Structures are given as structure tokens and as C-alpha cells.
Amino acid sequence: MLQPLSHLPAFSLVEPLLQAIVNQNMIIGAPPGAGKSTVLPLSLLNTHIKGKILLMQPRRVVVRNLAQYMAGVLGEQVGDTVGYRIRGENKVSASTRLEIITEGILSRMIQSDPELAGVAVIIFDEFHERSIHSDFGLALALEVQAGLRDDLRLMIMSATLDTAPIASLLAQHSPVPTAQLASEGRSFPVTVNYTKEVLAHEVIPHCVEVIMNAVTNHQGDILVFLSGAGAIHAVASRLSAHQQQNDYIIHTLYGAMGKQAQQAAIAPDPQGQRKVILATNIAETSLTIEGVKVVIDSLWENSAEFHPSSGLTQLTQTRISKASAIQRTGRAGRVSEGVCYRLSAKESFERFAEHSAPQILREDVAPLLLETLNWGTHFSNLAMLTQPSKAQSAIAIKALEEIGAVNKKGDFTAYGRSLAQIPCHPQLAHLLLFAKQNVSAVAQFSDAQKCAIKTAAPFIVALAQAQLQSEHVLISDALLHFTPAQRNDITKQAKRYAQFVGLSEQALDLSALDDEALGLCIAIAFPRQLAFKTSASYKLAGGKGADISLANPPQWIAVLQGQHIGNSVKIRLAQPIAEAHLKALYPNQFTSSPKVQFNKESQVMEARKVTSFYAIELASSPLSKSERADDPQFYLQETASAWLRYLDALPLKQWPLSQANWRWWYRVKLAAQLNLPQPQAYDTPDPWPTSLSELLTQARDQLAQSLGTCKNLQSLHGLGWQKILTSALSWPQQDALSQSLPDSVVIPTGRKVSLDFRENGDVVLSVKMQELYGLSSPYVVADGKVKITYELLSPAGRPLQTTKDIVGFWQGSYKEVQKEMKGRYPKHFWPDDPANATPTTKTKKAMDRQAAK
């Protein structure tokens, strides 16, 4: 069965794999081209393993292509022994034993059947990509293996995987031991060329230039890696314009394309014509594209990035990692020696990250949290290779609470369990259930409006997931201008969700959608993405500012897609909505309450009555003295809170701290660096604050008490900041600071001089040189751990010398200073033996007069 694949390097792993997997989990490391994704899964079919084999792949196009290829190796059709299952599409039968699935499918299979009855092996392919679904799927599979199925075998395969972390994870959480195997890749030498440094907006013209040169100077098909569909179509358009003759054919390859177009890009051209394939990173790994001898790598990719401040997830163009670049380069060496052009200077490439950050740290984890709660646990209890941050978890819990998936205590609700049964983002699932069950309870909506919402909801879900780009900002306009293929795709996706709103697929008609209902559906799913026109711009309900390119922007608009640019959001796809409809949907979010706010123009804190919708201020009016007198304590607290918000928005360097305050902080910072002992501590000493933000957090209560009476910016600057800062330290810390890091020393003249504690950790004594005569041993602080730096000044107060070794200075370079200063300041005392001379602040005449008395 595997004879046609025996030339592939991964074939050498078949025998040890079949021996080991009987009693062990497996970790397989093999570079691109080794054949691990085909040889090893197929090898498991002709063994004692009787159950089904699940092969997880991160991309739909790879799933289809692998299924087609492996079925062909067996001489069968897809759906016989080898089948596949992706969202909304499957080709499996009762005889299917090797099922290739996209990653999100596995978690749903486990949720519906925790024992995974009939499944013998789960293979996690391309695990190095660290997708959120593969991490979660592995965590669930480990729980199944540990609790229910110790006969289940897990197999993790990757091209660039650092195996130590995953081996450690399996050792901790699996009841089954783990074996590791590695294979060489099937790769001919590839010559890597770097072009020049190009900015992001210069990539497309530069890429076209490099492609045209490659067409002229090299043989074979050309595979071009670009960030996304937009860049692909831009390059394709320019290439077509430059094409002099029909000597090559242009293909595009990205996830949202139809199956036939994807297959045409992958397969050899029927007429044998040379191909230029413009692809995203879906061509980076398991996809085999024969005939490629040239790779042109833009070194960019589009990755989903979640912005908590707006609730929006957008595709952001980012640099790939070195590991991804190496994968892409290998595509040029599959059939013969090849060449790769990287569109960057080599020096810049060397600064790229070694590996991409795990997807779980960049994306919205609310869907993952919903699945985790539905499983009956929480993130922290799962065997996740990377845990979401505490901030991510808190944001996700808040989002689920707002739609009723969890209660205020964070407990999973029956409604949350219903949401978890719908295969889309929780907020979109909430839209579907609301349209089916709850919209009827909104008395202000007519029956026609309720029906329109129910019909529009599946289309909004489809649009939100498709991330289609349009020149038109309004969804109603964009739908009219979508291509027939786009309209068909959106309708097809929408029909998948018809059942969840209680409609038949035939009831969904894209051309009959109600414009008003489109905005209402977005408002139901994403209330914090509602935007209110303030003046020339918008304010999102989540608090972020936003802009829109629209001739007549409406007062309210519901945002489906937006792009973060700087500190604002560019609205890309949205739909108008009436305020009356928002009041019907969210009556409790339209509030009127007294607030204290900082007026930037007058620089005064003002008490006002503010009407709001979430974080949007709709109207405000000043409160009279009599109104404020009703509850003075409330306004003291509100004033303090307003000042804290004002200060929190400032960089620390802009806080109203004096130079003396900063010197004191550098003193504390030095104490933290030295871990200065606290002799007066009764028990375990309090840790020293290691950052100013940490210290200010510890002083926040004292700060809040002081801020309540501040009326304007001038009074803020006049606060007793030193007392506030000092309150952050315990009494033993204050005592240790005073004793071991004093803020001044007494110099030989008897004068007390302040020490200057600096940001770099230096402690500087700045004093006129004559006042240190007679100093024969250096000053030290921190029990001798820190030497003082002496900034020795001239009689005019100008720096002459800086040293940490005052004794060495007297014995050495002082002679040169003495010689120069005698000529410049002849009236002052410049002794030959300063270490034993009398310190003074006087001229020689004054010294003589004093001696004569």
C-alpha cells in the first residue's frame, strides 16, 4: 500500500512508529517534504489498530488536498477508507477509517462524545503553528485519555517543533509514556537571496519587480508568499498589466477561495504552462505543490489580533518568524535545486523572532472559555501548553456575563450551555438564539421587524466570520456590490445557521434583507461596537474613538468590522441604527447620573449630570452647589476617582512629581536593587517596590484621600507628593532607607549636603572641591555596598572632576587640576596635600584673616 511513498524520508519511521504506538504516545519531528502527513497516517491503517484515526490539520484546503492524495494512493475515492470533515462539509462513510479534520472539529467531537468511541489514534499535525484549536484539542484529548480512554493514542507531528515543552506536558498529564522519532526532510539545496529593505506599503511593487526578474532568470513554477487576499489581488493585477505574452499563468491561493480554484492552483497545469502562484501562508506546510523551483517570500502574513479596548478582532499584517521563513524556503527545493528571494535586507531578517507567538495569546478567548466551561472546568485546570493571561480571561468572562452565558459569580448557565451548541463565536450564537427566542419579547418592535431580524441574523453571522473586504462601508451597499461568487458564499454560510433561528434554508434570501434589521443584528451581538457621532468622529460604546469614510455619517452606527490605526478605529463595515431601537434593546444602558470630570480647557474638575450609553457620553450639564451639597462625601470620592483616571492616562514621567520626588524614588529603587535589609522588621520584611508604578499602586489609598479636595491642576501639583509616596513604604523600610541610604552627608566643613540619587543607580555628592580638603577616606552608603560619586566643583560652581575614588584623586590627577586652577582662581586655596589640608569655603585672604584672629 505504501510502496509509492517509500522514497519519502518519513518512510524510515514507519516500522519504529508501528512498534512504539502500541503502548506509547508519539512525538514526530520532520521538516517539510519528509512526507510525515501522508506516510505515517496511512501506515497506521495496516496494523493491529482497529479504530478510527483522526488527523487534525489547521487549514481546510490542506484537509481536502490530503484526503484526495491519500485516497489516490489507496486507489479509492475520498469518503471510502480516507475521508474528511470540515465545518459545513464532510465526505465520510461507514467504511472510513482515516478521517482528516480541521482543528475545531475535534473539540466538538469530544464535547458530544467524551469517550470518543471508536477512535484509536488522534494525530495533531503541524502542531508547531500553535493554533488555539490545536492547543485546546490536545488538552481535551489528554483529559479523555487520562480519565476514560487509556487505550487512546496521541501523536503530535511538526516540522519545526521544539519537542521539550510538549514532551514535558505529555509526561505530566498523560497516563501513557511518550516516545519521540525524527526524520530528515526531502529537500534539495535552495539558494537564499535577500533583496532590499522595503516598508509594508512598498511590498507590492517590489514583489512584482522580483517576480518579473524571476520569470526571466529562472526555470520552473514560482510560488509567491503574500500577507493576504488583498495583497494577492493587487500583485495579480499588476502582473497581468505587465505580462507581455502568455508565457505563464497566474493562480491565487488563499483560504476563502472556492475548492475548484484552490485545486487549480495546486495541481500541475493541464497544458503544461508555467505557473506563478500567489499564496498566503496556507501554502507553507502540508500542501504539496509540484513543480515549484522558485519561492518569493514577502516575509509578511495576516494574523488575527483581538483588541480588548474595542472588542474588535482584525487581521493585522505582521512579520513572520524565522521558522516560518525556513518553511517557505523549503518549498523551492522539493523537486530540484531551487532559489528563494526574501524581500528584506539580511540584517533586518536576522532580527526576526525565532518562532511566532502562540495564537492563544493574540486572540479573543471568549469562545475557548465557553467551550471550557461547557466541558465542566476552567482554563487553569486544563493541560494547556500556554495559558491565556489573567487579563484575557477576565475580558472573556465579562463578555460571557453580558450575554448571559455565565452569571455574576462566573458560574456557567443553562443559556451558556445552549450557546455552546452553536458552532460560532458566543456573541454571534447569542444573536441567533435572541432572534429565535427573545426578540418576540421586545414590545417596541413590530412583527415585521422581528421577522426581519430573524432572517438577517444568519447573514450577519456569515459576514462576521467571512471577514470579506469591501470598498463600501455600509453593509447594505456592500451586499449589493459583492460578486456573484461572494454572494453565493455568504448565502451558503448563512444557510448553515438557518436552523438556529427556526427557519428553513429556503427562507433565506440575500436580496430580500432589511437594512434596518442588519444594524439591529449587529447591535444584539456586539453592543460595545455601537458608535455615536460626537463631532467629526465617533465614540464606540467600549470607549474607543473611531472614524468613518462616509459622506453623510449617521448619528448611530453598528460596527461589524474595524481597523485599529494608532489610538483610533477606522470603521470598515457597519450599518446605521436608530437610537429608539437601541433604547428598546438596551433600556438599562441609557443612564443619567452625577459624575465628576476633568475639563481639559479650564483645567478644573467639574461636577456634571451625565447621560450615557455604556462609555459614550451623550449629554451633560453642570451641577449646582446645592445639588453637590446633598452628598458631599460622594463628590469627594468621585473627584478622587476622576483624578486617578486622569493620572492613570498619563505616562509616569508626566506625573506632577518634583525633582526631589524623583530623587527619592531613585533612592527607593536602589534599595530594591540591593534588597536593602530592614533590621526593624518584626517578621518577614515587606518586599521593596521594584517600579514606580508598583510604588504608586501601594500608595493609592493615601493618594485617593488627598485627591478628593483637589479642584484644579494647580492644586494637584501642590499636593504633598512626598508624604503620599512615603506612605507606600512600611515603617521598617522607611527606617532602613534613613539609616542605610541617607539623603545627605556632613562634609568636612561641617555643612550638610544633599546626595543626588540618580536613575542609573549612582549616588552623587556635588560640592566645591575646597570643602572636601582633609577627606582621607571615602563616603559609602548601604553598609559599604555603594560608593558615592564625587562631582567636584570649581569656586564658580562648575564641574572640574568626577570620581568615585577621592583618595586616589588626591594622590593622582589632582596635581593637574591644581596647576590649572591656580592660574584661573589664584585667590583660592590649592594645597599640595589636599588629603591633609583644612577644608574651607573662603578665599586665601579670608583664611589668613581668620587665622590672624
Model feature map: region roles:
Residues L550-V569, F757-I788, L792:
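Short, surface-exposed, low-complexity cationic segments
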Residues S440-K539, K544, Q555-S744, K785-K853:
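Acidic, serine/threonine- and proline-rich low-complexity intrinsically disordered segments
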Residues M1-L431, S440, F445, E505-A507, ...:
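P-loop NTPase motor module signature
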Residues Y538-K539, G545-I548, P651, L737-M769:
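Amphipathic alpha-helical packing elements
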Residues P32, Q57, I86, L226, ...:
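Active-site proximal loops enriched in glycine and acidic residues that flank catalytic Cys/His/Asp
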Residues Q111-S112, E202-V203, H307, F352-H355, ...:
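Short conserved micro-motifs at the rims of enzyme active sites and ligand-binding pockets
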Residues G104, L278-I282, L299, F532-A536, ...:
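Conserved helicase core region in the C-terminal RecA-like lobe
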